[in-house]
Amino acid sequence: MKFTLLAASLAVLSLGACHTNQETTSAGFADSTKIVSLSGAISEVLAGAGLEKNIAGTDITSNYPEALKVKPKVGHNRNINAEGILALRPDLIIGLKKDFNPALTAQFKTAGVKLLLVDQEYSVKGTKQLIRTLTDSLHVSAKGDSLISIVDTELAKVKPATHKPKVLFIYARGAGTIMVGGTGTQVETAISLAGGQNAVTEFADYKPLTAEALVKANPDIILLFDSGLQSLGGPEGVAKIQGIKETNAGKNKKIISMDGELLGSFGPRLGIAIQELAAKIN
């Protein structure tokens, strides 16, 4: 079970699991529609479009804006439990296509609940398309225009690093679970948008961290999620990992972190996330 949950979490961080096309189902939306949202990015779009009051429940990654933290939680979007969702008596379930297998989809349809399933591409274009698809489907297109405009405005404020520092992303859940991000991940895309470059190019997705790989990559900066940094005991704990002190990042104590949902969701706050990352790596 531990391996399954880890694999699920890393799959969310991989670009390879996503597609560029968007697919929608008629949402049949009304002011009284009760929605269960199964993605942090989707929930942010709904809230930004003025539909927060319609959200009856969310997955555990939906914690922004603050009001969503008190919404009933139905588990992780990579391990969807139909019974828990149906107990909230939703009219509409919105999620990512990759999280729904045919049996699960059939279960919701048999229960008479409408589904709106979309693909998500972790890019600037993909973020805008996600906003457009959701707001058009829910008949709040003007709100979508505003959200897309905000994304553009915030991205325009980014002051990318001029020297393209080598950034190594470490995904950690305590000292026993430490993975390093290779190519083809959404964090790599974020690093690139912020003006940096991925320190690891030899492999795709995520692999266990080794001292040899660390020294070879020799990153200028080590990046973690806030939760990952905390799980390792802060910067001091990261510095104790074998190989860290031999890197430029370790020697110069360049260990940074960001909120995982902000950095990795590629929702309406994408521009804000890239601004923050650019400031940290510059």
Identify the meaning behind each predicted range.
Residues 126-136, 145-146, 159, 226-282:
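Structured C-terminal subdomain patch of bacterial secreted/periplasmic proteins
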Residues 14-17:
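C-terminal motif of bacterial Sec signal peptides marking the signal peptidase cleavage site
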Residues 119-132, 166-186, 230-233:
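Extracytoplasmic ligand-binding site segments that recognize negatively charged/polar headgroups
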Residues 59, 183-206:
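His/Asp/Glu-enriched short active-site or ligand-binding loop at hydrolase and phosphoryl-transfer sites
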Residues 1-6:
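Bacterial N-terminal signal peptides that target proteins for export
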Residues 28-46, 142-194:
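Basic- and aromatic-lined ligand-binding clefts that recognize polyanionic substrates
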Residues 34-88, 92-97:
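A short, structured surface patch at a secondary-structure boundary
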